[in-house]
Amino acid sequence: MSSVLLFLLLLLLSGVSLSGCIRLGNGGYEEWRMGSATYIKESLGHPLNDGGGACGYGDLDIFRYGRYTAGVSGALFGRGSACGGCYEVRCVNHVLWCLRGSPTVVVTATDFCAPNLGLSDDYGGWCNFPKEHFEMSEAAFLRVAKAKADIVPVQFRRVSCDRAGGMRFTITGGASFLQVLITNVAADGEVAAVKVKGSRTGWIPMGRNWGQNWQCDADLRGQPLSFEVTGGRGRTVVAYSVAPPDWMFAQTFEGKQFVE
């Protein structure tokens, strides 16, 4: 057998696609890239379900992200810009640990996988820069690999997010500032820019405080609130009068959604 035929056979056995690309919304394409993945056992719990997480989502069931989620390394996280983005992931190049046929799973980036600079990149320092690594939920990991695996090589690519219902806006803040957590974002999943408008103001740009929490220094109490949200690929949606004039801090409101 020639070396070329042998190479192609190995690709097929490992489940690697020869097509290479997937169509994203707004005419974009993204190719498969190589990375790695580990997982957090459900029996150990997860910091997100205790109100933590670098994206600020807290309980993922409340915010409709479900069980197929992942923390991503700094090379992917982008200081929070990756929060809410969707990735298709499959285990490759490991006959022992990858599931047969290399099935895929789509995960949402909901947390940051912190580096461990005291360990080497290939032994414990999976999330050290510039590694592209996914620390997946157990449910997501078991869709592509066996539970006994500690770490597996994967291919991944950005895909559009499929969400039910509209974008959700959870309002917090105080007398001199407004903060909003934006969740359940379809299409890009990521949020690149946000503006807010009250009935007595123009559009006010908000800055990313952390994760998907956006903030501006303005007292907008007693005014209906509208939000302009720009996704990671430049598309903008305006959700008018999402919150009524009598809104209160810690309330969540649902507004317009990105549509492919």
Curated annotation (Swiss-Prot):
InterPro entries membership: Expan_Lol_pI (IPR007118), Expansin (IPR002963), Expansin/allergen_DPBB_dom (IPR007112), Expansin_CBD (IPR007117), Expansin_CBD_sf (IPR036749), RlpA-like_DPBB (IPR009009), RlpA-like_sf (IPR036908)
Signal sequence extent: 1-19
Family annotation (Pfam families): DPBB_1, Expansin_C
Domain of life: Eukaryota
Residues covered by the Expansin-like EG45 domain: 52-166
Inducers of expression: By gibberellin (GA3) and wounding.
Name of the protein in its database record: Expansin-A16
Organism expressing this protein natively: Oryza sativa subsp. japonica
